[in-house]
Amino acid sequence: MTNLIDLTFHELESLIVSLGEPPYRARQVWQWLWQKRCREIAGMTDVSKALRARLEEVAEIRWPVVEMVRESRDGTVKFLLALDDGERVECVLIPEKDHYTACLSTQVGCAMGCGFCATGMLGFRRNMTPGEMLGQVLVGRQYLTDKGVELGLRNLVFMGMGEPLLNYENLLKTLEALHHPQGLDFSGRRITVSTAGVARHLLDLGRTGLCSLAISLHAPTQAQRERIMPGAARLELDKLMDLLAQYPLKPRERLTFEYLLLAGVNDADADARELVRLLSRVKAKVNLIVFNATPGLPYSPPDEARVLAFQDILKSKGLTATLRKSKGSDIAAACGQLRAECDGEGEGEGK
């Protein structure tokens, strides 16, 4: 049976028309789904009983099921969500100064095989549907409402389980639904999609104007990247940078490059200088992330002095480089950790 939250607005409109109703009825149903977070068609009280009855014959509303919630001392909240087929994914609410950011998954598992990430250890299971991706936003907002939290869910980052651009069609439908003014009404400035670099849809995404882009880079050379991110090696760094140089940006906009610091792997002064050289070809800023030491993975975090020295080299060359503080380490908040823990398959670091 059709899950209404899987539908774009135009698909919902077509469904409503096929049931013999005028198209404007779709706006009413859409608002119930996204603004009022209605979970039963019968609860749409300003929709006619006849339409509700016909809708219930062909459709339903299915959110992901919250299987586990973990709350960190720093305010981070991690959800383990069960999908219709029993697969499980994760999403995270991250507290900021005046709002929350949700970190969303796009696939069950991942084919990229990054050596520092627990999701890669799971392998690729399947793509998530638009409703499954959007359902994470509904779950997050409902949690904050139920807790009476005053800070709202304002920003979305597609940096959870999976490679978003390998689920491009469903990602695009999700972004369109997020933008709809009579629904969740997120602006493109509030949405970031992170990719390891998939050539096929990279520029297509930029042309939509529906989000900002972040690149999961993590290494300044092709050889280093192949060692820690074997799946990303399909697109050579030089070719990736050539594509990114064509990526459509607003006048003051820059591409964000995520760089996970691994002791003795990619944190040397020479790595920092090579990173500056690599990024000189594009309008860039760097988000440095310190690896969280994790049993079962062959990596460790650099010490604070090494991290600051790396950052100082980038900044001295005129490159904006921020240091992202890890949150939720006490609740396995990095990508794939909670599912892997529950599956008994180990833990890892997110992108």
Curated annotation (Swiss-Prot):
Q: Which cysteines are joined by disulfide bonds?
A: 103-335
Quote the record's cofactor note. Binds 1 [4Fe-4S] cluster. The cluster is coordinated with 3 cysteines and an exchangeable S-adenosyl-L-methionine.
Q: What is its EC number?
A: 2.1.1.192
User: Where is each Radical SAM core domain found?
Assistant: 96-330
CDD domains annotated for this entry?
Radical_SAM (cd01335)
Chain positions recorded as [4Fe-4S] cluster binding sites: 110, 114, 117
**First-listed, main subcellular location of the protein, grouped into a coarse class:** cytoplasm
Q: Kindly state which keywords UniProt assigns to this record, in alphabetical order.
A: 4Fe-4S, Cytoplasm, Disulfide bond, Iron, Iron-sulfur, Metal-binding, Methyltransferase, rRNA processing, S-adenosyl-L-methionine, Transferase, tRNA processing
Binding-site residues for S-adenosyl-L-methionine, renumbered to this chain = 162-163, 194, 216-218, 292
Q: What cofactor(s) does the depicted protein rely on?
A: [4Fe-4S] cluster
Q: Which domain of life is it from?
A: Bacteria
| Misc note | Reaction proceeds by a ping-pong mechanism involving intermediate methylation of a conserved cysteine residue.
* Role played: Specifically methylates position 2 of adenine 2503 in 23S rRNA and position 2 of adenine 37 in tRNAs. m2A2503 modification seems to play a crucial role in the proofreading step occurring at the peptidyl transferase center and thus would serve to optimize ribosomal fidelity.
Q: What is this protein called?
A: Dual-specificity RNA methyltransferase RlmN
Organism for this UniProt entry: Solidesulfovibrio magneticus (strain ATCC 700980 / DSM 13731 / RS-1) (Desulfovibrio magneticus)
